[in-house]
Swiss-Prot record:
This is Adenylate kinase. GO terms for biological process: AMP salvage. It comes from Burkholderia pseudomallei (strain 1710b). Monomer. It catalyses: AMP + ATP = 2 ADP. It comes from the Bacteria. Its EC number is 2.7.4.3.
Length: 220
């Protein structure tokens, strides 16, 4: 099972990624984790990546793809792998295709932006413990107060509506075009000797268990 998980920030990809990893016994491939590990290990690609990171520059896609290919050779990828958060752009998707990275499924978890804004902007956190609440879906017993300590809850900057909207704008511009990219490739079929991935789209609305059932149905 080799798949890419697509969906906007706040669509619930992380939760479903954990279910997929557990069911199929595959690792989640995080480019951030790979970069940090390569830099720490001092591999040639890691050393090269560090020069960009130290200057505050984006690591080039060619370097990221090199790290991905190295990572996929490791033993835990024998049964497959899960990409969440990569590729983010058409250029990265093209680079993966040119590098011959095989993908069986591209799964999109679709949630309307209005729902994502409500989900994320309604979160409230107790900073000391990390306990989280939601003003609508999981409210504290006393408004604005932690259930255990009675201390004030805060809204993290990441959860503020304007921040969420900005992240969704970036997704709309950079990552949403991948939905068309992979849908078109699935219709065209194999290219350059690389099998086209099957494209699946499910609704990310409803209970976590309902969404999990949809995910597993889509991956049959």
């Amino acid at each position: 099972m080799r798949l890419i998980l697509l969906g906007a920030p706040g669509a619930g990809k992380g939760t479903q990624a954990n279910f997929i990893k557990e069911k199929f016994g595959i690792p989640q491939i995080s480019t951030g984790d790979m970069l940090r590990a390569a830099v720490k290990a001092g591999t040639p690609l890691g050393v090269e990546a560090k020069t960009y990171m130290d200057e505050g520059k984006l690591v080039p896609d060619s370097l990221i793809i090199g790290l991905v290919k190295e990572r996929l050779k490791e033993a835990d990828c024998a049964n497959g792998y899960l990409f969440d958060g990569f590729p983010r752009t058409i250029a990265q998707a093209d680079a993966m295709k040119e590098a011959g990275v095989a993908i069986d499924y591209v799964l999109e978890i679709d949630v309307p932006f209005s729902e994502i804004i409500e989900r994320m902007s309604g979160r409230r956190t107790h900073p000391a413990s990390g306990r989280t609440y939601h003003v609508k879906f999981n409210p504290p017993k006393v408004e604005g107060k932690d259930d255990v300590t009675g201390e004030p809850l805060v809204q993290r900057d990441d959860d503020k509506e304007e921040t969420v909207k900005k992240r969704l704008d970036v997704y709309e511009a950079q990552t949403k075009p991948l939905i068309t990219y992979y849908g078109d490739w699935a219709r065209r079929g194999a290219e350059n000797g690389l099998k086209a991935p099957a494209y699946r789209k499910i609704s990310g609305l409803g209970a976590v268990e309902e969404i999990r059932a949809r995910v597993f149905d889509a991956l049959k």
